């Protein structure tokens, strides 16, 4: 469950290390984002030679949350951290590698490039 001012680790090699959620996209009064949702975020920590710089405002898709997500079959899935993958204007990932597992909900949200780059889809 991601809301405004939530800090997330970045699960790709775009150069950013940590982002802070500014806004959850999808509806005017939408408060929370979960796995597979797109957010607008500000880069808080970044590598000096990365593609993404500190202070940049980016779009990102949430790939892991500490708060459990209930699946249609009744099972729950939760992760050890809150993580996101930074997107470009075409909703494709900026990085070329994804670190750590991603939730299956990312596939249902049609982010197939992220699913194919991920080492594990849970």
Swiss-Prot record:
InterPro entries named in the record: Ribosomal_uL14 (IPR000218), Ribosomal_uL14_bac-type (IPR005745), Ribosomal_uL14_CS (IPR019972), Ribosomal_uL14_sf (IPR036853)
Keyword Cell division: no
HAMAP family the UniProt entry points to: Ribosomal_uL14
Record carries keyword Ribonucleoprotein: yes
GO biological process: translation
Encoding gene per record: rplN
UniProt name for this protein: Large ribosomal subunit protein uL14
Family: Belongs to the universal ribosomal protein uL14 family.
Signal sequence, renumbered to the chain: none
Taxonomy of the source species: Bacteria, Pseudomonadati, Campylobacterota, Epsilonproteobacteria, Campylobacterales
Keyword set, alphabetical order: Ribonucleoprotein, Ribosomal protein, RNA-binding, rRNA-binding
């Amino acid at each position: 469950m991601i809301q405004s001012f939530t800090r997330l680790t970045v699960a790709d090699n775009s150069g950013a290390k940590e982002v802070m959620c500014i806004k959850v996209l999808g509806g005017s009064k939408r408060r929370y984002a979960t796995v597979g949702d797109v957010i607008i975020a500000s880069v808080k920590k970044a590598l000096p030679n990365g593609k993404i710089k500190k202070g940049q405002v980016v779009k990102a898709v949430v790939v892991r949350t500490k708060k459990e997500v209930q699946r249609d079959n009744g099972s729950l899935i939760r992760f050890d951290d809150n993580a996101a993958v930074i997107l470009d204007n075409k909703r494709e990932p900026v990085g070329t590698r994804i670190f750590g597992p991603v939730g299956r909900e990312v596939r249902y949200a049609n982010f197939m490039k992220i699913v194919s780059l991920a080492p594990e889809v849970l």
